[in-house]
Design a protein with these regions (language model features):
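Preference for intrinsically disordered or flexible, low-complexity segments
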Residues: 1-250
Length: 250
């Protein structure tokens, strides 16, 4: 993940100069994932095994001239023979949050479960009853707040950048997205780009090797900011990965 060896985000001018939003600009590289390294990454079209993610550094260039413009490119890794030592970068960006810090991935597989709002009502009621009982036990034992596990924060969907799994719908109502091209089956989560790797409510997902206070304070290693410190979920069609993707910011 990251923009390559381009140095820290501070080298980019976040002020829009005269005509900056109208002149052609190179898109920013956000992530590069190989299926051999990320087992849960959904398959690409036509035997593609390399997913490259780019976005435009200006909100105004998204759909209907608003929001984010995302570009996903599937490639066959064995066909990539010429690699740019110095990828092109824009002279200006609309927001510093569009410029990732260079990062090396260390994928780790975890078990995830659907967002609570998509579960059957009876199961949701059982989960709520269990959490209420745990809360009462914690209060009687004078345990500090959030020291008991909850489905939303500890057991279902982890924070941070992810490939595959289930999407969080913490900002909007839970939804099942259908492919705009075929509507053959519910779309599946391809990738989550998160502003933070953890927060105060999801500390149980923090890697053990990063729980030292000096390290734990840095929950934003990529420097990416999606919306108001939210996350971007990108969905793919399970019937045909070549169909258009959908996205949701939470």
């Amino acid at each position: 993940v990251g923009a390559g060896a381009q140095g820290p985000a501070e080298v980019f001018d976040v002020l829009v100069g005269e005509g900056g939003e109208n002149n052609p600009l190179p898109m920013i590289g956000v992530a590069q994932l190989y299926r051999r390294d990320v087992p849960d990454l959904l398959a690409g079209p036509d035997d593609s095994d390399l997913l490259q993610v780019f976005w435009c550094p200006f909100d105004a260039h998204g759909e209907n001239r608003t929001g984010m413009l995302l570009d996903l490119r599937w490639r066959r890794s064995w066909e990539v023979v010429e690699v740019l030592a110095q990828p092109p970068v824009p002279e200006r960006v609309g927001s510093e949050g569009y410029v990732p810090e260079p990062c090396v991935l260390h994928p780790e597989q975890v078990v995830t479960y659907p967002f609570a709002g998509l579960l059957p009502e009876e199961l949701c009621a059982r989960i709520e009853a269990r959490e209420e009982a745990l809360e009462e036990e914690a209060e009687e034992a004078e345990v500090e707040e959030w020291d008991w596990p909850t489905y939303q924060f500890d057991l279902s969907i982890p924070p941070g950048w992810r490939a595959g799994g289930y999407a969080s719908w913490n900002l909007t109502d839970a939804d099942v997205l259908e492919c705009p091209a075929c509507a053959a089956a519910p779309m599946e989560l391809l990738l989550t780009i998160d502003s933070k790797e953890w927060d105060g409510g999801s500390g149980s997902w923090m890697p053990l090797e990063e729980r030292d206070p000096a390290v734990a304070a840095d929950a934003e290693p990529t420097g990416v900011q999606v919306g108001r410190w939210g996350k971007l979920n990108v969905f793919a069609c399970p019937a045909d990965p070549g169909h258009p993707h959908l996205k949701s910011i939470q």
